[in-house]
Amino acid sequence: MRAHPGGGRCCPEQEEGESAAGGSGAGGDSAIEQGGQGSALAPSPVSGVRREGARGGGRGRGRWKQAARGGGVCGRGRGRGRGRGRGRGRGRGRGRPQSGGSGLGGDGGGGAGGCGGGSGGGVAPRRDPVPFPSGSSGPGPRGPRATESGKRMDCPALPPGWKKEEVIRKSGLSAGKSDVYYFSPSGKKFRSKPQLARYLGNAVDLSSFDFRTGKMMPSKLQKNKQRLRNDPLNQNKGKPDLNTTLPIRQTASIFKQPVTKFTNHPSNKVKSDPQRMNEQPRQLFWEKRLQGLSASDVTEQIIKTMELPKGLQGVGPGSNDETLLSAVASALHTSSAPITGQVSAAVEKNPAVWLNTSQPLCKAFIVTDEDIRKQEERVQQVRKKLEEALMADILSRAADTEEVDIDMDSGDEA
């Protein structure tokens, strides 16, 4: 407790923003220029002397920039009285103005951060808080951000009943930006895509869903698939490690020291075929499983198999024209390499050793210009037959249409 001139005292519990009710207070901390002022009237008994305080003034000094001043009149005579009280009010943070204090002598008010003592009690006028100057510590915790609510709209990408709302921020550093929210049919609010995915579960696939626009973006799904396809960790999974670069010695050194490599065959090199590594493993000569199967048309009539040229002859055990046809057809569709057949002449002696697995089971053949000319003639004949069939179909349809028109005209005349 600190004494002040004029008979007032400053209470230690008031130094943090309380005001004694017996006087007027004006003051504030380093962030407040000036608080409120007030006067009070109340009887102030003095022990042993039956007198009332005539006039008292208090000046309070605390941990604030400006001290409080106060004065009160309470009757006749001379004497000193004390007025103690606590200021009550609402505010945020330390050092904000408070008002509406009450004390022993009555009601009083003052600025938060000031304290004063004097005689009497009364009601002090309330003053509006002064804005904080530049360089101050601020008014305390920040309040809610001002926003402008948008209109809730239906979201066609989500199940029926889901609403989308876009709220625009009106204050702060991010003024002008917008936040997107989604509302379920029951009224539950969702602020992010993970929350939406956890709530919907497997009911809706949100992999290509754009949270801001509320639409399904197929390009987003393609990017995710492409990223997974180009992921080096995904590519190296299940593949042999053929990296021949030397590792770095794991020693405590600031310089990278490679490991010395010793080999008995310095000229050896590891050959790699990236195309072969990307191919899926398959059974050798799997075309033999198609043996004995035949295709049929819509009328369940077996389609006659095509005849191979005389230059194509099968090779190997158990080879026939049907197996050779399926082998050549699969090689044409699944491989981009040229088809040459089994070129090695030793394949007839020992097929298990000299057989080329990347070529169909047929002898080596040579395509001549005569073969190409015959094939072109066959193609022209087939195209001519197709043209004749299409023209006949068009004429038959036109005739049917004319008959229908004649029947309708005769019905109208009747």
Curated annotation (Swiss-Prot):
Domain MBD: 148-216
Cellular component terms (Gene Ontology): chromatin; cytoplasm; cytosol; heterochromatin; histone deacetylase complex; nucleus; NuRD complex
UniProt subcellular location: Nucleus; Chromosome
Chain segments annotated as transmembrane: none
Region (Required for interaction with DHX9 and PRMT5): 1-152
GO molecular function: C2H2 zinc finger domain binding; chromatin binding; DNA binding; identical protein binding; methyl-CpG binding; mRNA binding; siRNA binding
Keyword list, A-Z: Chromosome, DNA-binding, Nucleus, Phosphoprotein, Transcription, Transcription regulation
Protein's UniProt keywords contain Nucleus: yes
Biased amino acid composition, Gly residues: 98-123
GO terms (BP aspect): chromatin remodeling; DNA methylation-dependent constitutive heterochromatin formation; embryonic organ development; maternal behavior; negative regulation of transcription by RNA polymerase II; positive regulation of DNA-templated transcription; positive regulation of Wnt signaling pathway; protein-containing complex assembly
UniProt tissue specificity: Highly expressed in brain, heart, kidney, lung, skeletal muscle, spleen and testis. Detected at lower levels in embryonic stem cells.
Basic residues biased stretches: 77-95
InterPro entries: DNA-bd_dom_sf, MBD2/MBD3_p55-bd, MeCpG-bd_2/3_C_dom, Methyl_CpG_DNA-bd
Gene3D superfamilies per UniProt: Methyl-cpg-binding Protein 2, Chain A
Residue list for modification Phosphoserine: S184, S410
Residue segments, region Disordered: 1-163, 217-244
Biased composition regions of type Polar residues, renumbered to the chain: 232-244
Function: Binds CpG islands in promoters where the DNA is methylated at position 5 of cytosine within CpG dinucleotides. Binds hemimethylated DNA as well. Recruits histone deacetylases and DNA methyltransferases to chromatin. Acts as a component of the histone deacetylase NuRD complex which participates in the remodeling of chromatin. Acts as transcriptional repressor and plays a role in gene silencing. Functions as a scaffold protein, targeting GATAD2A and GATAD2B to chromatin to promote repression. May enhance the activation of some unmethylated cAMP-responsive promoters.
PANTHER family on file: METHYL-CPG BINDING PROTEIN, MBD, METHYL-CPG-BINDING DOMAIN PROTEIN 2
Subunit structure: Heterodimer with MBD3 (via N-terminus). Component of the MeCP1 complex that contains HDAC1 and HDAC2. Component of the nucleosome remodeling and deacetylase (NuRD) repressor complex, composed of core proteins MTA1, MTA2, MTA3, RBBP4, RBBP7, HDAC1, HDAC2, MBD2, MBD3, and peripherally associated proteins CDK2AP1, CDK2AP2, GATAD2A, GATAD2B, CHD3, CHD4 and CHD5. The exact stoichiometry of the NuRD complex is unknown, and some subunits such as MBD2 and MBD3, GATAD2A and GATAD2B, and CHD3, CHD4 and CHD5 define mutually exclusive NuRD complexes. Interacts with CDK2AP1. Interacts with DHX9.
Protein name: Methyl-CpG-binding domain protein 2
Organism name: Mus musculus
Gene from which this protein is expressed: Mbd2
